[in-house]
Amino acid sequence: LKEEAFILGMDVSFMDEIEQHGGSYRDENGQQEDLLTLLKMGDANAIRLRIWNDPVGGFCNLERTVAVAKRVKEHGLHFLLDFHYSDRWADPANQWKPKAWEKLSYEELQRAVCNYTADVLRTLKEHDALPDMVQVGNEITPGMLWDEGRVSGEEHDTDEQWERFAGLVKYGIAAVKSVDSEIKIMIHIDRGGDNAESRKFYDRFEALGVEFDIIGLSYYPWWHGTLDALRDNLHDLAERYGKPINVVETAYPWTLEQPDGHEWILNQEELLLPGYPASVEGQTRYLKDLLQIVREVPGGLGAGFYYWEPAWIPSKEEWSVGHPNNWGNLTMFDFKGQKLQSFSALKAGLENETEWDEQPNAALIK
């Protein structure tokens, strides 16, 4: 029996593009260092990477993902692969099929999901870079592979559509298990602070027999509510489904300063959580309190978290995703790539590890 470690994760999917264009990172003393090394020195133990089918800019496709995944494995970090099943961002507002799949029938789409998922994982396996965990879809609250797998909006929120959506997800899960049955499956939605919507989603998946290992939630306070709402939701979902839960996307600003030519996604004081200013101290407090909430989930079912793009520094003007960097104040590095003191929150999280290990942790044991 192997106890699963508490995940202190980072999604660094932009790292490849930043490095290729000359961006770099430094430790607290200004010494240049490889990003993965810096993250590991900062107590991160897991990396999440997104994969797009055929992205315009070429980053986050299979070839580039293999190169980065090999580095993740060489650093001895836990690896979560996030399938978007799209050529671009898949999120609650966009779940568009890859261009190559646009004309497929529903049955062909199921086969495409299955074949593509298995091909990606087999390729990673050949390079000794197999993920430990896989997300079948990204923030799939509204379904995925629209419109075949769409469940958002009255017209699509029907039993029949949920069955079609679940059918696509099941083919993805089967493909993962066919390559390596040990890989854990995460199902990820965006409703960190919304218990009613979270229940609705996971109740549907339970009723439809979707078999997965871990609940993944995004939680951005300016979209998803208070930390109390997050805590209440995590507690309820743990008791209701008995599955480990990971807050698989979150972030908080270290500044509201906006360099010329940038417009941050979060740039208004009134969107901040009371008591958590947009400062390195505020960001640190946010992370400490968030990690405490995840650790306190009943039954030891709080499995950890991932910070979304802590290293997406504004190192250049044009990005392969077709829009400017809108995240540069939500990172854990300053605008020039120097590591912030907020990594200390992860260390504080680790110091609780001993008492954590003594808690009943059956659900996290393989």
UniProtKB/Swiss-Prot annotation:
Keywords: Glycosidase, Hydrolase. Belongs to the glycosyl hydrolase 53 family. Pfam families: Glyco_hydro_53. The keyword Hydrolase applies. Transmembrane segments: none annotated. InterPro entries: Glyco_hydro_53, Glycoside_hydrolase_SF. This is Uncharacterized protein in bgaB 5'region. It comes from Niallia circulans. GO terms for molecular function: glucosidase activity. The keyword Translocase does not apply. The lineage of its organism: Bacteria, Bacillati, Bacillota, Bacilli, Bacillales. One of its GO terms (biological process) is pectin catabolic process. Signal peptide: none annotated. Gene3D superfamilies: Glycosidases.
